[in-house]
């Protein structure tokens, strides 16, 4: 039996601890622990309970001990853009806001007063999203300036959890890149930009690459979980880890990291920053080994998850797909990236209102709603492919769908049909796998990214969906 590695993969709706090891050149996975996640509604704010999340991280580690499977290392990935501010005693200042909170409303205009959006894109190559850290910090500066003044350190959430485990503060690059405050040429914070915006530059720690050691567990953590290990940086932005696990050795093709969000793009050795990319709202996020994830953020399965929730989770996703197929001729489509779908009080009403506003038939049944969502998502993928190929100046043969959404066979087929390209679906646990790959390369069990991706290809089933003739 090979050495165990622990991936702690925390998404916006759930978290999981997955143990991985190599056996006969293949990666074996075992889910050890899973827990629910979600933003808390408190006094009209959407917040993360980081103490609860840290407790869940420890709970999963204890499960490893209970099962007698002690990992040699662990790494943590989460969603992007959210952070904590720490004071001089390393206590959290203020609330830990979630990216769907409305405090950033109007903050793009405030940032644009200091730096026009075209200049900001030229500097960072990052897609404008109202929840990006740059806008969250502007909200902080405008509404609670004393917190920024008192802050000693800014840590993105996975870095904060790493600090709680080891006592060492490190800032990881891939997640840092999503803040819209990083220079894509230097792979470090853009101090000129930070100064211009009036943010305190000394709170930003030097960015470190995936594959960097964070440290050993603190003595009190060792005592609580019953063992020691090394904490290592993976691509701590979950999409960076997921893209690492695309089972294509050259990394040369279109991918969709499909989950609550759909991140659709290509891997590039250089950032693609030009007017066309800016207008199409593509982003250049940091990836493993100094690569760039040139991609577009698409609303993803959030809409269907929300619709299901409105119906009290009475239907499984498989049932929703069947009902959508029964209503496949329902003609209405929505722009899945419309801001009205980001954080509505009621997703079903938001979809109906959009159809009404755009003069389309209003969906009434669950099947009609599901059909609108799935087909609109596939249509968005088709438009994104056209845009991507135009900007990249080339065509691509296939699309790799990774992550939880790769299990949605119905959507995979719609995607093949909408794009006219063969879809390769899997692995579903791409984020955890990418997290593990970074640790295995660090431990020299795998040599590099190319061999790691070949290992993914050899280890997991990939399903194929061909466009309908």
Where are these regions (language model features)?
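Short acidic-aromatic active-site loops that bind/stabilize oxyanions
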Residues: 46-54, 126, 130, 207-211, ...
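Short beta-strand-loop/turn "lid" adjacent to the catalytic site in phosphate-handling enzymes
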Residues: 62, 66-99, 127-131, 162-183, ...
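Active-site core segments that coordinate phosphate-bearing ligands/cofactors
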Residues: 6-7, 19, 112-124, 138-151, ...
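N-terminal glycine/serine-rich phosphate-binding loop of ATP-dependent small-molecule kinases
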Residues: 1-94, 122, 222-231, 419-421, ...
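Short glycine-rich phosphate-binding loop at a beta-alpha junction
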Residues: 70-78, 153, 206, 394-403
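Short alpha-helix plus adjacent loop in nuclease-associated cores
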Residues: 97, 101-114
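Short, basic and Ser/Thr-rich N-terminal targeting/leader segments
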Residues: 11-13, 72, 77-79, 133, ...
């Amino acid at each position: 039996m090979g050495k165990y590695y622990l991936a702690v993969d925390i998404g916006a709706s759930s978290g999981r601890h997955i143990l991985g090891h190599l056996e006969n050149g293949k990666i074996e996975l075992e889910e050890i622990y899973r827990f629910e996640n979600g933003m808390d509604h408190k006094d009209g704010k959407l917040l993360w309970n980081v103490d609860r999340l840290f407790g869940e991280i420890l709970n999963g580690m204890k499960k490893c001990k209970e099962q007698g499977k002690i990992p040699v290392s662990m790494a943590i990935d989460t969603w992007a853009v959210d952070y904590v501010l720490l004071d001089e005693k390393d206590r959290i200042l203020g609330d830990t806001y979630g990216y769907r909170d409305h405090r950033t409303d109007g903050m793009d205009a405030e940032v644009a007063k200091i730096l026009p959006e075209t200049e900001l894109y030229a500097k960072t190559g990052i897609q404008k999203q109202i929840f990006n850290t740059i806008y969250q910090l502007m909200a902080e500066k405008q509404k609670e300036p004393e917190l920024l003044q008192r802050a000693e350190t800014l840590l993105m959430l996975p870095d904060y959890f790493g600090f709680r485990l080891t006592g060492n503060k490190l800032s990881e690059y891939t997640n840092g890149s999503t803040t819209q405050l990083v220079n894509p040429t230097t792979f470090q914070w853009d101090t000129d930009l930070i100064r211009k915006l009036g943010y305190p530059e000394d709170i930003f720690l030097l960015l470190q690459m995936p594959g960097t050691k964070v440290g050993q567990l603190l003595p009190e953590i060792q005592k609580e979980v019953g063992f020691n290990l090394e904490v290592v940086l993976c691509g701590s932005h979950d999409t960076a880890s997921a893209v690492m696990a695309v089972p294509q050795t050259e990394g040369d093709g279109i991918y969709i990291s499909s989950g609550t969000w759909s991140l659709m793009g290509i891997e590039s050795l250089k950032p693609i920053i030009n007017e066309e990319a800016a207008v199409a709202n593509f982003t250049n996020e940091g990836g493993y080994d100094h690569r760039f994830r040139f991609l577009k953020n698409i609303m993803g399965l959030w809409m269907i998850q929300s619709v299901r929730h409105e119906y009290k989770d009475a239907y499984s996703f498989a049932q929703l797909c069947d009902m959508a197929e029964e209503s496949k001729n329902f003609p209405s489509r929505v722009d899945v990236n419309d801001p009205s779908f980001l954080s509505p009080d009621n997703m079903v009403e938001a979809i109906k209102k959009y159809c009404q506003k755009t003069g389309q038939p209003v969906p009434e049944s669950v099947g009609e709603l599901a059909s609108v969502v799935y087909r609109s998502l596939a249509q968005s993928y088709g438009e994104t492919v056209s845009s991507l190929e135009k900007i990249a100046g080339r065509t691509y043969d296939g699309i790799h769908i990774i992550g939880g959404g790769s299990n949605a066979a119905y959507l995979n087929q719609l995607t093949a049909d909408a794009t006219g390209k063969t879809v390769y679906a899997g692995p579903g646990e791409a984020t955890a796998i990418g997290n593990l790959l970074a640790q295995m390369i660090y431990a020299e069990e795998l040599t590099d990214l190319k061999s790691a991706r070949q290992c993914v290809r050899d280890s997991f089933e990939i399903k194929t969906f061909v466009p309908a003739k």
